[in-house]
């Protein structure tokens, strides 16, 4: 399998912790933590055929600083033939009306650039009203709620890593 580029915003330690856990759970796959998103350039995204991108959702459904500044640039890239798996952190109890909306914003940007999204997961087990991250009844990636469901995080990451390894290798979307 080709090297995977891992991109995430370091604005919150939780996102960094989840990125580290994902890298560990992908054992045997070469993952290069590119640079923190605040130091990423367009050519960093174009250098990888397989990418994992992550961000938390802030306030009323916004991306953290740096990701929000990078989205217009992402949308203008040519990422046809590239696969992107997204992970996002959110709080379903306190923000049920925009739960992990940041993932949806990233998904829109990468799709506009021509990338194929992989790593879709079930919405079962979450209690929320609305989310921009839901596509066809599934989340457009791995959803982590460390505030309310931390006990489920390790299994969710392990299951998702197994799934995206297969999808990156085969091109199959769940």
Locate the predicted segments by residue.
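Short acidic/polar alpha-helix capping motifs at helix-coil junctions
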Residues: 2-5, 35-38, 70-73
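N-terminal beta1-alpha1 ligand-phosphate binding loop
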Residues: 3-25
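Residue-level recognition of beta-strand->loop/alpha-helix junctions
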Residues: 8, 35-36, 88, 121
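Short, surface-exposed acidic/glycine-rich loop or hinge patches that mediate macromolecular interfaces
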Residues: 9-12, 39, 57
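FMN-binding flavodoxin-like domain, especially the glycine-rich phosphate-binding loop
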Residues: 17, 25, 29, 47-174
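A short beta-strand-loop structural module common to alpha/beta enzyme folds
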Residues: 29-41
């Amino acid at each position: 399998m080709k090297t995977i580029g891992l991109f995430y915003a370091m604005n919150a330690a939780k996102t960094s912790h989840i990125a580290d856990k994902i890298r560990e759970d992908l054992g045997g796959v070469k993952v290069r933590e590119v640079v923190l998103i605040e130091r990423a350039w367009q050519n960093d995204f174009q250098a990888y055929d397989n990418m994992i991108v992550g961000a938390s959702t802030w306030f009323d459904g916004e991306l953290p600083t740096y990701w929000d500044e990078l989205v217009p640039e992402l949308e203008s890239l040519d990422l046809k033939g590239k696969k992107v798996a997204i992970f996002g952190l959110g709080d379903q109890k306190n923000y049920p009306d925009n739960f992990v909306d940041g993932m949806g914003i990233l998904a829109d940007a990468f799709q506009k650039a021509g990338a194929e999204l992989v790593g879709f997961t079930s919405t079962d087990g979450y209690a929320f009203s609305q989310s921009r991250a839901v596509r066809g009844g599934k989340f457009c990636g791995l959803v982590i709620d460390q505030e309310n469901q931390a006990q489920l995080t390790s299994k969710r990451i392990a299951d998702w890593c197994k799934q995206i390894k297969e999808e990156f290798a085969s091109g199959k979307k769940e």
